Amino acid sequence: MWNDLRMTSHTAQAGSRTRLDRFFKITERGSTVGAEIRGGLVTFFAMAYIVVLNPLIIGTTPDGTGQLLGGGTDDPNLGMIAAATALVAGVVTIAMGVFANYPMALAAGLGLNAVVAFSIAGLPEVTWADAMGLVVIEGIVILVLVLTGFREAVFRAVPVELKTAIGVGIGLFITLIGLKNAGFVTGDGATVLSIGDLGTWPMLVFIVGLVLTIVLWVRKVKGAMLISILTATVLAIVLQNTLHIGAVSETNPGGFNSAPEFTGVFAVPDFSLLGQFSLLGSFESIGVVTVLLLVFSLLLADFFDTMGTMVAIGAEARLLDSEGNPPATRRILVVDSIAAIAGGMGSVSSNTAYVESTAGVGEGARTGLASVVTGITFLLATFLSPLVALVPYEAAAPALVLVGFLMMTQISGIDWKKVDTALPAFLTIALMPFTYSIADGIGAGFIAYVIVKLARGKAREVHWLMWLAAAMFVVYFTLDPIRAALGI
């Protein structure tokens, strides 16, 4: 009898695993359930900082009427914004996993949130509801472009070498993000960049984490990145509780960039921000022309940021086809577009694809199951926000550095003797980290590609959509002079 029960139990479990395997194509893509779970967790820890950082960017900046996001003029509503940030990120990331079966997580976009906070919400008479309404409009526009096939057509018109360069450039960019977040490099010196103070306790946490990450990875230990993140976090907590290091500031330059602080385990989330947006308010406060320019700038950054991240993840996971396209491209772009809309509706700024997803891919993630794991963890973070704050930048940064190396290996796919694509590829790679913008690097590469082809008398070889994309980027780069000329 007991043997029959055990056999029935094992059969049910096997059937469940088989259904899960078939749905997410886990075995087909050379992965395992364990690898997907580890990858999903690593991705979450690599980008969990957004739950803390997004509130600090959009929650501490008053709008054009002097009001803070969530109401009030003095005390930022950081807890409310953190809960909404985690909720929206969790929902759209799960959607990416289930609908598109792609190991790519989404959350409020860094850079995009700064644009919303400083370039839109801060305009005279503009409210936070107006600013979030513009984000919703941008998301709707980009969704229409996906459904009509235009966004996917632009993506497929990009030469393979430029797609490869985008992945390599993002690798350098994410390495710089990791080094900067850890304080290993700084821009505070006499040079553009210089090495940080290596004699601090937070730097010790980063270095220990980096060494451990490298050692575990070269020895092919499963869960290398996750183990290093958790180990470095424990070290940071011990140092913080014994030495009371605190957060970095002018009076405490040797502090943590995000000090681990235990304030409890659970927190009841406040979702009051959801739905606090106005679709038409900005048209009344700043006018139609300004609205169009602002939506266009948001759209371009979102449009090509996602394209670059999508390619980088696919290349690292070896999911791209011979033309450099990931599977189910349209489904990926549909979810990404809906995420932008959801970000505006949730009052947390446009949600977009996160390049930190490559950290999970580096840990073995190959399917949407990893995204589901990441999304569920974000949903848990709405209740466990105190625990999320325990992971300092210094503990998560080593994973980003290693991922940067892994993405750099793609550079062998570029023929450097073929100047038509080599020069644009170089500019794409170089300008992403140097401008601290994925979109700027892609734009420079697109424009250079058209110029080189034109100069060599090969204009007919350029796809008409590449001409259009290059022209759009010219407008993108000249938006500030255009605004100045129009007095807006």
Model feature map: region roles:
Residues 45-49, 99-109, 142-145, 220-221, ...:
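Short helix-coil transition sites and intra-membrane helix breaks within transmembrane domains
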Residues 2-79, 194-195, 229, 233-330, ...:
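Helix-loop-helix hairpins and the membrane-proximal interhelical loops
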Residues 85-97, 114-117, 173-175:
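A generic, lipid-embedded transmembrane alpha helix
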Residues 7-8, 88-110:
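Juxtamembrane transmembrane-helix boundary signature
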Residues 29-40, 74-82, 86, 127-131, ...:
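Hydrophobic, aromatic-rich alpha-helical transmembrane segments
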Residues 17-50, 54, 88-89, 109-118, ...:
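Helix-loop-helix junctions within the multi-pass membrane cores of secondary transporters/permeases
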Residues 124-238, 372-488:
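Membrane-embedded alpha-helical modules
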